Amino acid sequence: MDNLGESPTDKAGEPGESEETRATPGAPVSADTEGIPEETDQVGDADSKEAAAEESELKSQDVSDVTAAEREDPSLLTPAAKKLKLDTKDKKEKKQKVDEDEIQKMQILVSSFSEEQLNRYEMYRRSAFPKAAIKRLIQSITGTSVSQNVVIAMSGISKVFVGEVVEEALDVCEKWGEMPPLQPKHMREAVRRLKSKGQIPNSKHKKITFF
């Protein structure tokens, strides 16, 4: 009988224990469910970073596309940029045209040279004043040191000047009915003629008197 009296309470307690024991295995499950949002947050952060990177790439690509489109389509440029682009393009075309014209004229001129003129032209092209001597001369006159660019410029100008004097001397020799080689009298007459034409500046200092 005692066993029969205790059985209801025991039976009532056993289901309670079974419910607790059934509830306890669920505890890790709740812990797992709490951990799932953390993983989703990390995934969300990674997705947002990837989205931001993709957006920046798209923006840079759009900017590059716009600049490329502006280069291809002049109508997208601003008026100042259009004018600058046209000016540089015109300058390049004009310079290229001038260079081509000069080359063509030079080719025609050289093709019409005689053998003697061609030899003289080749000698003139290869000739050059020694830059060290030109530099010493400039420094002795000015009393100051000069740069290499000034020496190169003066050397080229001197070469052109001597070429003009020699050409004028050859004309004098031909006019006098004489044959080359050139003599000092031909050179002196050539310098005199160039001075009379105003192509050689007067080296003598003239005092200007004011009345």
Swiss-Prot record:
Key words, A-Z: Acetylation, Nucleus, Transcription, Transcription regulation
Modified residues (N-acetylmethionine): M1
Signal peptide: none
GO aspect biological process, one term: RNA polymerase II preinitiation complex assembly
Molecular functions (GO terms): DNA binding; nuclear thyroid hormone receptor binding; nuclear vitamin D receptor binding; protein heterodimerization activity; TBP-class protein binding; transcription coactivator activity
Chain residue ranges for the region called Disordered: 1-98
Protein location: Nucleus
Biased composition (Acidic residues): 35-44
CC terms in the record's Gene Ontology section: nucleus; transcription factor TFIID complex
SUPFAM superfamilies in alphabetical order: Histone-fold
Biased composition (Basic and acidic residues): 8-22, 46-74, 84-98
Family annotation (CDD domains): HFD_TAF11
Main function: The TFIID basal transcription factor complex plays a major role in the initiation of RNA polymerase II (Pol II)-dependent transcription. TFIID recognizes and binds promoters with or without a TATA box via its subunit TBP, a TATA-box-binding protein, and promotes assembly of the pre-initiation complex (PIC). The TFIID complex consists of TBP and TBP-associated factors (TAFs), including TAF1, TAF2, TAF3, TAF4, TAF5, TAF6, TAF7, TAF8, TAF9, TAF10, TAF11, TAF12 and TAF13.
Subunit structure: Component of the TFIID basal transcription factor complex, composed of TATA-box-binding protein TBP, and a number of TBP-associated factors (TAFs), including TAF1, TAF2, TAF3, TAF4, TAF5, TAF6, TAF7, TAF8, TAF9, TAF10, TAF11, TAF12 and TAF13. Interacts with TAF13 both in vitro and intracellularly; also interacts directly with TBP.
Family: Belongs to the TAF11 family.
Domain notes: TBP and TAFII18 bind to distinct domains of TAFII28.
Protein name in the entry: Transcription initiation factor TFIID subunit 11
Source organism of the structure: Rattus norvegicus (Rat)
Encoding gene per record: Taf11
